[in-house]
From Swiss-Prot:
Topological domain ranges for the Extracellular compartment: 50-83, 133-163
Membrane-protein topology: Multi-pass membrane protein
Sequence ranges on the Cytoplasmic membrane side: 1-28, 105-111, 185-190
Gene Ontology molecular functions: protein histidine kinase binding
Pfam families in the cross-refs: CASP_dom
Glycan attachment residues as annotated in the record: 67
Transmembrane segments: 29-49, 84-104, 112-132, 164-184
Organism lineage string: Eukaryota, Viridiplantae, Streptophyta, Embryophyta, Tracheophyta
Species the sequence originates in: Arabidopsis thaliana (Mouse-ear cress)
Entry GO CC: plasma membrane; plasmodesma
Protein name: CASP-like protein 1E1
Subcellular location: Cell membrane
Predominant cellular place of this UniProt entry's protein: membrane
Membership in a protein family: Belongs to the Casparian strip membrane proteins (CASP) family.
Amino acid sequence: MEHESKNKVDGMEMEKGKKESGSRKGLELTMRVLALVLTMVAATVLGVAKQTKVVPIKLIPTLPPLNVSTTAKASYLSAFVYNISANAIACGYTAISIVIVMISKGKRSKSLLMAVLIGDLMMVALLFSSTGAAGAIGLMGRHGNKHVMWKKVCGVFGKFCNQAAVSVAITLIASVVFMLLVVLDALKLP
């Protein structure tokens, strides 16, 4: 009798362990899909951000201003190109890691767990650094810099600046999702 109840308890514990493992895997898969969507959206929003405006330039105070058509594009600023590239790399990595998680079906070796953990950690570093770079340039565009005589450009290119700000915010959220994935990965290590 005692042996049977022990088996039942062990059986219940085993089923409970499977449920926790399945729900943890489901959480991981959901977070990876979320990271995939966030990085794809962030790269796309900033990649297509473009605005053209006619800007009056006054060359000589006595003459009327000269109207010049000016375009703001993400490809004109290296920090924005870096942000787009970082999001594209993270998106590609996430697609690969989703396939690995789905194929492994809970049978991941320690070396595979470590590889995914290191990959996730690299994405955290990459995305946080690109967020910082793009955010710094975005703030410079929004507020200018009086010390070096850089003028605000977001007053002219408001739509472009807003798209850049949205992309940077989405990248920051994706960075946090990857950071949470690192924590989940670390909890799986034996």
